[in-house]
Regions:
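Iron-sulfur-cluster electron-transfer modules
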Residues: 1
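Long, contiguous internal "core" modules enriched in hydrophobic/ aromatic residues
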Residues: 4-8, 12-181
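Surface-exposed loop/turn and secondary-structure junction residues enriched for glycine/proline
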Residues: 53, 189-190
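Short, highly charged, low-complexity non-transmembrane loops/tails of multi-pass membrane proteins
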Residues: 190-196
Length: 196
């Protein structure tokens, strides 16, 4: 069933790409809602796949879906911010707000995830992430590069109302690099403890 979600989202993305190439704003408007639903469905399916690993307690948290949805928003805003360097993307303020909102939501959900108390295996995995072998990757890559830097750059871009896309593109690149660092640490942490 998840394959259908992925195929539908890929089809919507392909149609969006064609609409962009042909400068068909009407089709892009029609595809906006299916694109958002497809992105949310893809993030949801990813959470479902993690939940199938029942021996990995860290991946069973009820916050996993909200974290992945917030990360999907972050990745979408980051992608548009970077594309604005080579394409003329309208509404760059909206893109900055989407990126900032995604980063803020991701930070809030990650904090809730770390502050919550689960099983002993969850506690060990969180300890590995925040104070163990993955701590530098998590704090420097995931939090500083992936959350603090993009938020600061997006706020600066909104405050200065600059016409140059470089500032927001830098925020987007930092956000995606941080998402990678966080997710890598999250997956490693889940695997660092014995199966429950």
């Amino acid at each position: 069933k998840g394959a259908y979600v992925l195929m539908a989202f890929a089809a919507v993305c392909a149609a969006w790409f064609v609409a962009g190439l042909t400068d068909n704003a009407g089709l892009i408007e029609i595809l906006a809602i299916p694109a958002v639903l497809g992105a949310a469905g893809t993030a949801g399916y990813t959470a479902y796949l993690f939940a199938q690993c029942e021996g990995r307690d860290l991946w069973q948290t009820p916050l996993l879906l909200p974290v992945l949805l917030a990360q999907a928003v972050t990745a979408g805003g980051a992608s548009y911010a970077v594309m604005d360097v080579i394409l003329d993307i309208p509404e760059t303020d909206a893109i900055a707000w989407v990126l900032l909102g995604g980063v803020a939501a991701t930070a809030a959900f990650v904090w809730m995830e770390l502050a919550s108390h689960g099983s002993r295996h969850v506690e060990l995995a969180v300890e590995t992430t925040t104070h163990g072998r993955d701590a530098r990757q998590f704090w420097v890559g995931g939090v500083l590069v992936g959350m603090v830097v993009p938020a600061a750059l997006a706020i600066l871009a909104l405050a200065t109302d600059t016409a140059s896309p470089a500032l927001l593109a830098s925020a987007g690149i930092a956000a995606v690099a941080g998402l990678f660092a966080y997710e890598d640490a999250f997956v490693r942490a889940g695997q660092s403890v014995p199966l429950s």
